[in-house]
Structure formats: C-alpha cells, structure tokens
Amino acid sequence: YPDQTLIRRNAIYIREHLPNVQTMSQMFRRNGYFATRIGKIYHYNVPKHIGTSGHDDPYSWDATINPRGRDKTDEDLIFSLRPGSFGGTLSWLAADGTDEEQTDGIAATAAAQLLKQHAKEKTPFFLAVGLFRPHTPYVAPKKYFEMYPRERIVVPTVPKGYLATLPKPAQQSLLRKKDQVNLPDELSRQAIQAYYASITFADAQVGRILDALDETGLAKNTVVVFTSDHGYHMGEHGYWQKTTLFENAARVPLIIAAPGMTAGGKTVSAPAEMVDFYPTLAELCGLTAPASLPGVSLAETLNDAEARPRDSAFTQYGSGYSIRTDRYRYTEWGENGKDGAELYDHQSDSAEMVNLARRAANAETVARLSKVLRQRITYAGKPPKGIKQIRFENRRRVR
C-alpha cells in the first residue's frame, strides 16, 4: 500500500526507495522461471517513453522488449486538447495501417513468438505483457473507430448542484483538469469513441496472445491474469481520465484462468485488491511469497466462486481513503475523516451519484463502515517487514 512503501506518485525507480524488495517476477526468477517484460509494466510517461524501458526495474527480468510502433512516429497527427501534450490530457488518432504496425500490435507479436519459443524449449516462464492502450493518446487503426458511430454515443450528464453534495477534496479531484470541465457534447463523443476504439484494439491484441497460448498447447498448464492499473472516467461525474476515489477510477478488471480450476466462467462477487495478485500467483504455482506481502491469496475463488478471501477492497488517493464492500462504497477525506465523507449504496446507485453520508438514516451504516475503514488504514500503514526503505521527497520528479 502507498502508506507502507511511502511511494505516492508515479515516475519513480523502485530501487531508489526499496532497494531490497523482491518483486513478483523476481520470485519466479529465483524459482527457475524465465521472466520477460514486454511493454509497459512499471511506470512510463506515455507516449514519451514508448520504445524505452521507462521507469523499469532491470532486476525483475531475464529479458525485456520495448516495442515502438507507428503510433509513436505519427505523434504529429494526434489531436490533443492541450497541443504538444498527449498523455495527461484527452488526445486521439484514428490511425492508418494495421494492428501489427502499432506498438501494442508489435508487443502481441513478440509475446506470441516468445510463447512458441517457450513451448519448443519446454522452459517455465513468467511473461508480463503491458499494453499501452487505452492510455492516452487513444491511438488505434481506423477500423476500430468505425465500430462506434459517434451519433450513437451517449455523453454522461451531471445534475445541477451535484458538486455541492461532495466533500471539498472530492470536488477538487473532479475539477483538477480545468481544460476538461464542461466539454462540448460533440468533443465528448469524439473522446468516448476514441477510448472505445483503443479498448477494442487492445482487446484484439490480448486475443492474439491467447490464440498463441492455445496454438502452442501452453494454455493447459499456464496461469493467465488479465487486469489493468486503474479504472477510468469518460465524463461520469463530469470528469475525464483517472485519479479519483469513485468506482470509475478505483475499480479495475480482473480475470484469472488457471489449470484445474473448477469455477471457470463464473463471476466472484467478493472484493479483491491488486496487492492480492502476488500471493495468489505464488500459491497457484506452489511457490513461497515473501512474508512482507499485505495481500491475500485469491486462489480458493478459482474453485469456489462463493469464497470470500476478503470482505472489502481498499483504495487510497491523495488525502482520501475508500473501501468497497459488496453493497457500499465508503470514503473519508483527511485525518479521521475531518474533511468529509461519502457513502454510496450500489443496490440503488451503481453510478455513485447520491452521497448518503450525511443523511441521518444512514448514521449506523456510516459508523460501521468508518470503523472498518480506520482498521484498514491502520493496517495499510504498517511498514513492511524486512524491507529496507530509503526516504526521499515524493515531489521530486524522476525523468
């Protein structure tokens, strides 16, 4: 968790701060697996670092591949709300050419080739493929844009006075990108179309990698995890992109497939966290994970979709902390919630538009969830055992 690692921003080389940490891929390397990174796994400034190792950790891999496609060389063709900037603002391009010419297409090709090599050599492997899309700029071949006619796209709306129902820090999180507030509907539809196109393009590249698993026969004894590093707003709550504590930004996709699983094709309702991936993969592969890990294994859910390894998912951003249970999202801002709270009931408000935290009828629920959240905050702030930390100013930029 950020309060354990003290890393609360991007653009950091992990060894500068945690020099003796054992990363997940290192665990596999130390147990005889050949570990390869393709594309964006650690932080990258996008698209600036495409074709480089970004803020990668070289100790984590036996081999790395840094694909660079025509999306990088065609940057001058990209539309951007902020001319000259691409990654931190809304930007897109309906590109010419084929999937295989794009950076992520090149990554998928490399992954497929590597899988064929491992199948031939019968070597155990850990392969991490990080696709850049749908990170801005939303670049995908034109055919993917054509799948989503703009006239059919509905732009999310926000009721008048909505911001006043939120604590000040939550309001500020929705207003931080000034040039993206109150976008015209047509521009919004263009952005949504481009986002959908880039997701579908990325999905096609995942499909190519999975096809290679099937074709090589590796699928029968390979664990596959599909996920992302954060969720996204596309106009919901009047906001675009990431970094809020709403479901849109805090929730990520998670699909796990493993040999011998009996709950295949089922959805698990229990909450899960990203810190759970490491212990889960360790258990599935019969390895011993470091004792310092804060996560829990999700392995039991692969055979029992009703299993509940944890009861809430914990998220931290800025001065805010949030938990998500089966029914509720509860968020507090500032120390002990002094800057306000939010409560959303997903049974009646899956869009999280009605803050119930200050309603008397919900006082008991707020008190109960606040207690759980404080316990989670305390646990998430305990320094990890056996991990050396080098303190530094988190505002310092690492280029």
Model-derived features with residue positions:
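Active-site segment of extracytoplasmic enzymes that catalyze sulfate/phosphate-ester chemistry
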Residues: 1-22, 27-37, 47
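A short beta-strand-to-alpha-helix junction
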Residues: 12-22, 100-101, 164-165, 192-201, ...
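Short beta-strand segments
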Residues: 39, 126-133, 223-228, 255-256, ...
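Active-site regions of oxyanion-processing enzymes, predominantly non-cytosolic
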Residues: 45-69, 102-162, 214-223, 364, ...
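C-terminal cap/loop subdomain of S1 sulfatases and analogous C-terminal strand-loop tails that border
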Residues: 54-55, 60-71, 100, 118, ...
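Short glycine/proline-rich turn/loop motifs
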Residues: 86-98, 172-193, 258-261, 348-353
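A long, amphipathic alpha-helix that forms part
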Residues: 105-119, 180-222, 376
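Histidine-centered active-site microenvironments of extracellular/periplasmic hydrolases
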Residues: 137-143, 212-266, 273, 310
